[in-house]
Amino acid sequence: MVIPSNTTVYVDADSCPVKEEVISLARTFGKKMVFVYSYAHTMSLPKDVETAIVDTSKEAADLYLLQSVNRGDVCVTQDHALASLLLVKGVIVLSPRGHVYKEEEMPAMLAWRHTSQKARRAGKKTRGPKKFTASDRAAFYHALYAVLEKIAKE
């Protein structure tokens, strides 16, 4: 895929644990950053970080991201459904744990998500995500570095 040189790094920022890593690497590679979050999750960010503050409705940040991204942009999100929609638009999507999402894995990920939601609605307990660790943070840093380095070389 040919990536435009004006790539923007978007962050689904409400519960993103790797904001500092995104800021550091986007600065290193000279990329514009846009952090999208609801006004219920106010945060203090450096002046060079563009922010989009959205309503608290369930999908407001997702809708903003879907309307704003362009082919070749990068997005950090934990939301598998959002990731699947962004991939179709040609966006490079990473999880905060450093997983670079691929279109071919999304059907299985979404099916698992659906099964878990169904079980929770039926009153069953399901496992939540594992605790975020230092190795998750390092994996994210290396994955985002590799993505931005590849873009810089194209």
UniProtKB/Swiss-Prot annotation:
InterPro entries the record matches: UPF0178
Chain ranges passing through the membrane: none
One Pfam family in the UniProt entry: DUF188
Top-level taxon of the source organism: Bacteria
Cited HAMAP family: UPF0178
Sequence similarity: Belongs to the UPF0178 family.
Protein name, UniProt field: UPF0178 protein ABC1688
